[in-house]
């Protein structure tokens, strides 16, 4: 049984003992009792990813492609995995600025956590505010909130403005297609 995410930590904690013959994998989480006790039993594997590494590469790639201007970051919930994406992204931008001749800023007011991974409308609203303030590209580590940001980028592009998104977790290029005939997407890359 593969459990995607920290919200299933307590369920796996209970299930791994109750169903000793079953095998469990939990992604981005460690089985725990909801308190201070955690246990990865012999029938369970806990897997974490190095989000900061893909965030870094996305930051460098986006900075090289755009060259100069303001970037933004929209996170879903403020949890360690999403924070690692943010940190890596910021470090990638800084690296590109210091070593590769780019001039990208990631201002504090353009780093926002929506609070959920499901509020599509909230993601669109946050992205609209950022694009309207001059942000050129937004990294979205936010689940469905990121789909809202992608939708807003398409709206901005339809209005003749520059708007890019850096997707997360999988290749989101197709989510950002706004010109099917020419296969053009608002998704610059994905981490």
Name what the model sees in each region.
Residues 1-191:
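A residue-level marker of the well-folded mature domains of exported/periplasmic proteins
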